[in-house]
Design a protein with these regions (language model features):
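Short, Lys/Arg-enriched N-terminal segment that forms or immediately precedes the first helix
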Residues: 2-20
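N-terminal helix-turn-helix DNA-binding core of bacterial DNA-binding proteins
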Residues: 14-54, 73-77
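A ubiquitous, low-specificity "background" feature that marks scattered single residues
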Residues: 31, 63-64
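Short, hydrophobic-biased segments on the C-terminal half of alpha helices
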Residues: 59-60
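Beta-hairpin "wing" of winged helix-turn-helix
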Residues: 64-74
Length: 77
């Protein structure tokens, strides 16, 4: 199976408004706190109390804002 490819904004495409908007949600902010150790994490580790569909939504918002990088290999990001 071919890994899924995601769009990640370049530095020029990023905007402060989008980054701050992505971080304004308490759930996404907690996800970033968990990522702050600098290690790679399985996406399901980021918010273990959320349904997968909700978690996918939040990881997409963070990725599209340029806050996180998602690798389409399993669920690690």
């Amino acid at each position: 199976m071919t890994p899924r490819e995601y769009h990640h904004p370049t530095a020029e495409e990023m905007s402060l408004t989008r980054v701050l908007g992505a971080l304004s949600d308490p759930t996404r902010l907690e996800m970033i706190r968990r990522l702050a150790d600098g290690l790679e994490h399985d996406s399901l580790e980021l918010a273990d109390d959320l349904p997968r569909s909700t978690l996918t939504y939040h990881t997409r918002i963070l990725r599209e804002a340029g806050v996180t990088w998602t690798r389409g290999e399993g669920r690690a990001c």
